[in-house]
């Protein structure tokens, strides 16, 4: 079981993001209407990103910037 570190929601509560760490990498669960759309690890081009990066990604998901 993975412990969720932080949860964010869109204003209309249709989009939700859950931030958690697994194997020393932050991940963001991207959810619409209770359905998991994607679990995105916060790694790009071999770079493991910070919690702050994961929070930005979660916020972008909730705002609809990431689709």
What positions do the PLM features span?
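Mixed-charge, Lys/Arg-enriched low-complexity segments
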Residues: 1-9, 32-67
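Short N-terminal "domain-start" leader segments
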Residues: 1-31
